[in-house]
Swiss-Prot record:
It comes from Tetraodon nigroviridis. Its EC number is 7.1.1.2. It is a multi-pass membrane protein. This is NADH-ubiquinone oxidoreductase chain 2. GO terms for biological process: mitochondrial electron transport, NADH to ubiquinone. It catalyses: a ubiquinone + NADH + 5 H(+)(in) = a ubiquinol + NAD(+) + 4 H(+)(out).
Amino acid sequence: MSPYITASLLFGLLLGPTITATSSHWLIAWMGLEINTLAIIPLMAQHHHPRAVEATTKYFLTQATAAAMLLFASTTNAWLTGQWELQQMTHPLPSTLIILALALKIGLAPLHTWLPEVLQGLDLTTGLILSTWQKLAPFALLLQLQPNNPTLLVILGVLSTLIGGWGGLNQTQLRKILAYSSIAHLGWMILILQFSPTLTLLTLMLYLIMTSSAFLTFILNKTTTINALATSWAKTPILTSLLPLVLLSLGGLPPLTGFMPKWLILQELTKHDLAPTATLAALSALLSLYFYLRLSYAMTLTIAPNNLTGTLPWRTQTTQPNMMTATMAASSILLLPMTPGILTLFNI
């Protein structure tokens, strides 16, 4: 792909969420979402492989459906209330439709089935963009909404945490595991959205840091399956020692960074007399923790076969880990002691 085209597409990726996040009008916000979608589709299809083309087609159809639902809901709201403002979503019907449309856009359960399949068909770099940057614009809208249907958000959140944990248990492909991990984390964010939007924002920020560090390490090691992780210690030994901690942090294990949002969310849920919901969410975190432990075990406690097939990947030259990957990995592990400062920063 021409560097000029790539630069234009990356500019579109930056422009779309910026328009959506700064807009207060539904039509402008919808345009920002569509710019974002149209910018990533050529990046997804740049490798002319049947799986990539299939993934791009699935992604386009899903996003087009969600965009049509969103436009229909905002038009219905304007018809019923005479308002196009984001904060004036007062009627329950368009409000529910918009939440479902945004849930389909980001891949919340039970509207999640496209996400693992699409992510599996992409290369790791585009998968990183899809799992992190593409979540920002829909979340910018969700954070501005005043939800009229809190029960729907709780149902979507609990289903996502359970299905995200359950779905990743029998996977061997890293991209599918990270897709189910994404679904589970999005469930935690939606669960707490109506009670503490700033806590949702904090959870989203930490999710972006931890997921980016995992993806960047897999990109450096060129690994896409659990079996290939066994050879990664010979390629980048320092990162291989850090990545299991990053994965356990994604699972929410103390004393790592990922424990912070889960701990704060469970505390907030119990404050609002939702102890059964908090219990279900905590149990679903154990499901997710199991497949993160599988990955950590494959990286640290297994030895690759000592034959020609197993030895060849060790001898490939890899690029040296860059500063961004190292910084993100460190942030994914070491931020828990800074919880009081972070809470003050976010006014939680």
